[in-house]
Amino acid sequence: MPVQIPPTKLPRVGTTIFTVMSQLAAEHGAVNLGQGFPDFPVPQRLVDELDRAMREGHNQYAPMTGAPVLRQAIAAKVLRCYGAQVDPDGEITVTSGATEAIFNAIHAVVRPGEEVIVLDPAYDCYEPAIELAGARGVHVPLDPATFAVDWERVRAAVTPKTRLLMINSPHNPSGAMFSADDMRELAALLDGTRILLVSDEVYEHIVFDGRRHESVLRWPQLRERAFVVSSFGKTYHCTGWKVGYAIAPPALSAEFRKVHQYNVFCTFAPAQHAFAAMIRDEPEHDQQLGAFYQAKRDRFRGQLLGTRLKPLPVPGGYFQLVDYSEVSDLPDHEFVKWLTIEKGVAAIPLSPFYENPPPGQRLARLCFAKNEATLDAAIERLQAL
């Protein structure tokens, strides 16, 4: 008798769009501006420190919460960047990437039947983690033109079942950033409630035009109820290493670690020592990251002006949204496949970031975390649209 496979726990989930488009790009020899990974080298100092860590014997299980030397370095960086003192022992947990940290945070505090508010468009790992926790995602759309938060709509979405609110700044896919006024609105909304917060800040150092990243760590009244998530992969151009971390108050960290220890237990040990050395000895790397990517953004946007694609503003992050309505009226998922197969440039549609995409929206996401030669090759093809 055939084995009876139980019904899927994630009926709305298929293969992630990032994998789909990267595979399509490889099959058709397209320039891949879809998936958000750099195609230039990681800092040589980081490679040297990784090699040193392995040669010095840091090759066995790291402590479950993370190597002490890295947690101490993160605490020093948080104090330097945001003026916040965090306890490296009780408040910092090193994770196998930011996605693991987000999953852990949701599963640490959300119970079946509860609700999690998600601001759409949102990174596609949020909703499956919520569903696997037996909870329901309540999706509140951002302004379709500016990707600003409508705080009245967020307030209207709060119910007695609301346990968690997810925020992301700088925002993927738009690059929009929370302002100080947004943080005050957020604090007022959560004050006196049982609602907790996950703040996805993986692009924290990639901010442009003199803006300030409003980390939740700057706001004590928010920090006391928050998991703040970041990623070394985004900061040091090494997305394949999959190392991130979460900062939360001791009581929340204790619950977070209960999930973490039975999920991955610990994270790649040599990389933890390498990142600790980089934070300690080369703080200028994250301090200069915004200028590094702003130069790429400005050059790429200037080139896009010579195409029929309309670039939207990019305050932070390393993605450029483009309006393709002058090129095609195809839905975005069809347009990006056509663009990849017929024109040789891979992009990401916006619809997978939404529960209910805005009708008639014609936007695609391009990644400019690439070598100039890669971007030039893409622009040459886009100019032919």
Q: What function would you assign to each model-found segment?
A:
Residues A276, F292-R301, P311-Y324:
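Conserved glycine-rich beta-strand-loop-beta hairpin in the small C-terminal domain of fold type I
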Residues V138, L142-D209:
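Active-site phosphate-binding strand-loop segment of PLP-dependent enzymes
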Residues W219-E255, T267-P270:
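Active-site PLP attachment segment
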Residues P250, T267-L289:
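Structural motif of enzymes handling amino- and sulfur-group chemistry
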Residues R155, W338-A347, F353-L385:
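PLP-dependent enzyme catalytic core of the Aspartate aminotransferase-like
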Residues A108-I130:
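Conserved PLP-anchoring active-site segment centered on the Schiff-base-forming lysine
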Residues P2-G97, N104, M278-D281:
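N-terminal small-domain helix-loop-helix segment of the aminotransferase-like
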Residues H58, F256-H260, I279-G302, D329-P331:
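Structural signature of PLP-dependent enzymes
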